Amino acid sequence: MISRTRQEALDKAKTLIEALPWLSALHGKTVVVKYGGNAMTDPDLRARFAENIVFLRYAGLRPVVVHGGGPQINAHLERLGVESTFTAGLRVTTPETMEIVRMVLVGQVNREIVGLINEHGPFAVGMSGEDAHLFTAERKYAMVDGEPVDIGLVGEVVDVQPGAVRSLLDDGRIPIISSIARSAEGGVYNVNADTAAAALAVALGAAKLIVLTDVEGLYADYPVNSELISHMTASELEEMLPTLSSGMVPKMEACLRAVRGGVPQAHVLDGRIPNAMLLEIFTDEGVGTMVLPDKDPAGGDA
């Protein structure tokens, strides 16, 4: 009779063997991870996230992290007595607010992520989207009742220069990138981290885009139907977009943009689940929702 301890060891070995085809397929491939939500504020989840990213690196993948920092920005604005408002789900970013956003994302959040990862080795290197002209953005307007509304220094990424990121990856490093972008005129913009991550994934020719959220993934007809959609095509997602909640729209638009731009797979995962990334990447079952390119009539990707 096999002891409980021996059985647990055998189960672990089975899990490792199950990962073999995924390790083989993804060895040397780039994976862009958008990090945000509750996973950024819970100390245990933050530590587990750092471990997962380092695991990917040791497993032979080339992880890149793009992060936001909404909760931390809100906390600093409140502490400094600066009022923050939202229009159509987007933060109205005055020059005063932009200064705080930049300080928090680049000077606090980025450094914390770099520090957590580097507890496991000299891997992480912090960057702003401004550095080496990585992200260039143009002003974005919110749409209210079909009319464009000025929301200040909020930008949409229109150009990506990924050379510096590639150099870091080639050197075995893990780039950690804050979602700040330059303008062609020399200013700075606050950009959505989901869309920035998607743009970078396309520019790098990444094998996967992974977006961490505070929900399990995309539901078939929430709240009427809470059945999780495990996978869907780009066209199916595009058809579903108008029905989604405002919080899910930028995340799913990022997935759509990524696969339409040539990224083979985009995933939305619950960052509150410990090791969710590893479950999605290295197991047959996976977790969350995976978006795939459309198939052409010949059976290949469109």
UniProtKB/Swiss-Prot annotation:
Q: Which GO terms describe its cellular component?
A: cytoplasm
Q: Which family does it belong to?
A: Belongs to the acetylglutamate kinase family. ArgB subfamily.
Involved pathway(s): Amino-acid biosynthesis; L-arginine biosynthesis; N(2)-acetyl-L-ornithine from L-glutamate: step 2/4
User: So what does this thing catalyse?
Assistant: N-acetyl-L-glutamate + ATP = N-acetyl-L-glutamyl 5-phosphate + ADP
User: Which chain positions carry the site (Transition state stabilizer)?
Assistant: 34, 251
Q: Which UniProt keywords apply?
A: Amino-acid biosynthesis, Arginine biosynthesis, ATP-binding, Cytoplasm, Kinase, Nucleotide-binding, Transferase
Put simply, this protein is called Acetylglutamate kinase
Gene symbol of the encoding locus: argB
